Amino acid sequence: MKKELSFHEKLLKLTKQQKKKTNKHVFIAIPIVFVLMFAFMWAGKAETPKVKTYSDDVLSASFVGDIMMGRYVEKVTEQKGADSIFQYVEPIFRASDYVAGNFENPVTYQKNYKQADKEIHLQTNKESVKVLKDMNFTVLNSANNHAMDYGVQGMKDTLGEFAKQNLDIVGAGYSLSDAKKKISYQKVNGVTIATLGFTDVSGKGFAAKKNTPGVLPADPEIFIPMISEAKKHADIVVVQSHWGQEYDNDPNDRQRQLARAMSDAGADIIVGHHPHVLEPIEVYNGTVIFYSLGNFVFDQGWTRTRDSALVQYHLKKNGTGRFEVTPIDIHEATPAPVKKDSLKQKTIIRELTKDSNFAWKVEDGKLTFDIDHSDKLKSK
C-alpha cells in the first residue's frame, strides 16, 4: 500500500519536479503553491470569536473602517453569498447595540450612469445595503471620495436604497440642506448617540449644493455648527471623518487640526478612514481619535491594506467608557480576528499605539483602554 504523502512532502516533490522543466513553468507553479499554502494557513488561523457580554453595560457599539462591496468583492459574494464575508465578525455585530462603518461606494441600479472625471470608480448593487442591515449595522457614512463616482443618479440610488432598508446614512444628501439634516440619532437604554459624517477628500463637484445631491465636506463652517447641534441633543457624539493620505500610516497636520476642531465642537469619538492602512489612536481633551481604522471589507492585496481593526465600545453603569480594539486580517475580502500572541496581532497593536498619549494594555488578544464617560450618563 502506497504511503500517503504529507502536504510538505507533496510540496517538496512538486519543487523537485519543477527543476526538470523550463524556468517559465517554475515561475508559474511556485507562486501558485505559495498562494495555496497561504490560503491553508489563513483558513487555519481564522476563528469565529466568542463574544463576551457584560452585565454592567449600558450600551455597546462597534466601529469599522472602509467597506467596499464592488469589484472583486462582488465576485466573492456572488460565489459564496454576501453574508459569508462577515462570517468571522458577525457575532460581534450581533452583540452590539450600534454598528457603524464607511460605505466606500455608491449603489447603482443601472450600469450606464455617467462616471465622474477621475481614475478609479467604485460601485455596488442594492444587495450590499441589505446585507449590512442584516449584519446589524445601524448607520453608514457616505461622505467620501467615491460616493459620487457615478454622479447625481448614483447618489440618488444610494440614498434611496438606504431609505428602503431603513438604515441610517450620514455625510450626504439630496442637497446641502438635506445633507446637513442627516445627523443620525440612536437611543439605547436612555443614552442617545449622534453620528455625523464629513470628507476632506473628494472629487470635483462631489460636494452637496443648494439644489444638487452630494457629500458634506470637512469644512469647519459646516461641521462645527453641526457637531455643536448634535451635542445639544445627544449624550455621545460620533464623527466619521474621511481624510488623510492614502497608504500613509501617520496622520498629517491637516488631520490633527481637523480632529482638534471637531473635538472642541463636541465630538466624543472620531472614526477616521481613507488611508486604507492603520494609523495611531490619540486621546485629545477626552475625545478618542482613531485616525484610520484601515480597510474592513476591500479587495486590496498588499499586506498593510489587509491589516485592520474592529473597535468595540462599552459604556458601563459606573461611567467608564471601555474601548476594546480587535486586530483584524482581511483575506479574500473577508475580515477575521487574528490569533492571540501572533506576530500579526503585535504588528497591528504596535501601529495603533505608536506615539500613544494614553494608558493601554493587551487583554485576551485585544488592545484595551478606559476613558471617563460618566458625563454621558447624566441624562439617564
Swiss-Prot record:
SUPFAM superfamilies listed in its UniProt record: Metallo-dependent phosphatases
Disruption phenotype: Cells produce PGA but at a greatly reduced level.
UniProt xrefs under Pfam families: PGA_cap (PF09587)
CDD domains recorded: MPP_CapA
Function comment: Seems to be required for maximum PGA (gamma-polyglutamic acid) production.
PANTHER family, per the entry: PGA BIOSYNTHESIS PROTEIN CAPA, POLYGLUTAMINE SYNTHESIS ACCESSORY PROTEIN RV0574C-RELATED
Family affiliation: Belongs to the CapA family.
Protein name listed in UniProt: PGA biosynthesis protein CapA
Organism the protein comes from: Bacillus subtilis (strain 168)
